[in-house]
Regions:
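Polar/acidic, low-complexity leader/linker segments enriched in S/T/G and N/D
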Residues: 1-25
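Short beta-strand-centered interaction patches in the first periplasmic/extracellular domains
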Residues: 2, 74-97, 130-215, 246-274
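Surface-exposed cap/loop segments at beta↔alpha junctions
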Residues: 2-7, 45-130, 180-184, 254, ...
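N-terminal export/assembly leaders
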Residues: 26, 33-34, 38, 96-101, ...
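Acidic, glycine-rich low-complexity segments with interspersed aromatic residues
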Residues: 27-54
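Stable alpha-helical elements in mature extracytoplasmic
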Residues: 111-115, 149-154, 307
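Charged, gly/pro-rich, cysteine-poor intrinsically disordered low-complexity regions
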Residues: 195-315
């Protein structure tokens, strides 16, 4: 019988000796249309001195089943539940992205690799050579948990460049093109007797909205009042050419500004946001049922036709 082993830094939690219970959730989207999040939680006993810090947040956790490494995760929390008992909760690299903010911004031809690495921060990521130099145009919003996260902005980039995300066993994220071959075969022994399949209405056409952002001259007040040093002002839409009166702008981007202490007003100029619908008929012989993608704001004049073709192939 294979034994579960969990390595937390230099500490090994092994099988029946001190691993008392646990759950591992390893999930893969068959269509690669969702950035799935893996998790691990377990209860274990430790013979270490009670004053020893067992692990720190973000420390690497490696899960083995028998001799086979199954996943690399990271400590999200570790709690002492008794004199020598602990509870560990670990998350995957994609799960870490769901806890991270990303300020977004306006993109005017930056490479996909530079944007992806900026979104992932300290999480290691490899972008396949045929994707890394793809130029990206458009806008990403300010994403901050719990309502949104860096994971959402990464998903936007992947959609725009036609890529999927996988995770190596060492925890490194890998951005690569979709593969049209057979990944695996699920035989009768692995099927669920109570499973069901929903036969959805056939799609007649698909559409995507192409976005264009250009600097405009319409001014908008973004903040008026008293601020503490370092206060963060987040905009509802992208802005440029910020102007402050009564305090200074310490740091800014298209979606935000950090300001110094003072009482005054912050203004900015709006971007002109133009949209164009790109539609493609899939099947003329079915009732009208169009499937659309409207809020993918990295779909631009440069890639809108390619995105529409990929969406048509998907459906």
């Amino acid at each position: 019988m294979a034994v579960n082993r969990i390595l937390v830094g230099d500490i090994e939690i092994t099988g029946i000796y001190n691993l008392t219970s646990g759950n591992v959730n390893l999930t893969t989207s068959l269509l690669n249309d969702v950035l799935e999040m893996d998790t691990l939680d377990c209860d274990f006993n430790s013979q270490l001195d009670s004053s020893t810090i067992l692990a720190t947040i973000g420390e690497k956790v490696v899960y083995y089943h028998g001799d086979q490494q199954r996943q690399t995760l990271y400590v999200d929390s570790i709690k002492r539940t008794g004199p020598s008992s602990y509870h560990l909760y670990a998350i995957s690299a994609v799960s870490k992205l769901d806890t991270m903010l990303h300020p977004g911004g306006i993109y005017t031809g930056q490479t996909a690799e530079s944007i992806i690495k900026n979104i992932c921060g300290e999480i290691p990521v490899i972008v396949k050579s045929n994707l890394k130099n793809v130029k990206v145009y458009g806008w990403l919003p300010y994403c901050s948990p719990p309502n949104s996260s860096a994971r959402d902005n990464l998903n936007q980039v992947l959609f725009a460049i036609g890529a999927c995300l996988t995770t190596d066993l060492n925890g490194v994220l890998r951005v690569e093109t979709f593969w049209d071959g057979t990944i695996s075969t699920i035989d009768a022994k692995k099927t669920d007797m109570v499973g069901s399949v929903t036969d959805n209405q056939k799609i007649s056409a698909i559409s995507v909205i192409e976005h264009q952002f250009a600097e405009g001259q319409e001014s908008q007040e973004l903040f008026n009042g008293t601020a503490q040093n370092g206060d963060l002002i987040i905009f509802n839409e992208p802005m440029h050419t910020l102007s402050a009166s009564g305090f200074s702008v310490l740091e800014s981007g298209a979606n935000y500004a950090k300001i110094s202490a003072g009482t005054g007003t912050l203004t900015g100029l709006k971007y002109i946001h133009n949209k164009r619908k790109i539609a493609k008929v899939i099947n003329e012989n079915v009732p009208e049922n169009e499937k659309g993608k409207e809020n993918a704001t990295l779909v631009s004049l440069v890639n809108s036709v390619a995105v529409a073709e990929r969406l048509a192939s998907f459906y």
